[in-house]
UniProtKB/Swiss-Prot annotation:
Pfam family, one: OTCace
Main location: cytoplasm
Binding positions (carbamoyl phosphate): 53-56, 80, 104, 131-134, 259-260, 287
Cited Gene3D superfamilies: Aspartate/ornithine carbamoyltransferase
One annotated GO molecular function: ornithine carbamoyltransferase activity
Compartment annotation: Cytoplasm
Cellular component, GO annotation: cytoplasm
Descriptive protein name: Ornithine carbamoyltransferase
Keyword Amino-acid biosynthesis: yes
Role this protein plays: Reversibly catalyzes the transfer of the carbamoyl group from carbamoyl phosphate (CP) to the N(epsilon) atom of ornithine (ORN) to produce L-citrulline.
Amino acid sequence: MTVPHFLTLFDLPADEIRQLVRRAIDLKALQRQGKIYEPLKNQVLGMLFEKSSTRTRVSFEVGMIQLGGNAVFLSPRDTQLGRGEPLEDTARVLSRMVDCLMVRTFSHSMLEHFSAYSQVPVINALTDSYHPCQLLADIQTYFEHRGDIQGRTVAWIGDGNNMCQSYINAACQFDFQLHIATPAGYGPDPAILQMARERVQIIAEPREAVRGADLVVTDVWTSMGQEKEKHRRLQDLADYQVNGELMSLAKRDALFMHCLPAHRGEEVSAEVIDGPQSVVWDEAENRLHAQKALLEKLLIGGPL
């Protein structure tokens, strides 16, 4: 039997990933009502971190606990990976001891290699190429505030990084238009763009990209592992800050999202991220609920 992994948004059919978002909304409501729902009793999630994170660790760990299961945190110092054990051996061993594996790492090809040797589902909790769990939370947040995102326009401003590339995938899976504004040399992977030609436009000027948008999204200009490039990146991306002037060109009821952590005064101004159009705190919380829906789907096939 094929093991169901979740490495990109394309690992689930469009109708199932849409159902997953709606299920996340239902699970959030259950929790708010104080109802106990523990379908994952006696199941264990192994959490393998090469890149540190606040939101990823807490949301997955709390999510498993709320669903009745448990989670085990593993950093490179906690495994033999840090001492040269082959990746495939680690995958084989861990997948005999836990029911699901969540991996947050740098190389997407490494994650693909790891998952090929795992006997249990592997979840991409972030690679340098994609961040699909965050997109589940983002789409859930849009659904909650504005309804279905199908047919809407999303503007991505800034670095064409893993979040941008996951938005490209989301444009295909959720059927919306995506405008991407990045400086020269900072665009997303052309091969990823090629898959979504009908739904994605590259627009050099940020003002044109956000004009009429329903949702404006950005991310940090310097990702983990790029610290040596920070000074150059700040200069190159200086004209791509999401501020009040830029947001005024989007629709009057447009939302602003950022996966956090944010750097006020760099990729976004304080007036925007702390303003009335910002839904970043709901977006952050929804990592918990979206990932609970994902764990339920991968481990038991859906709601009991």
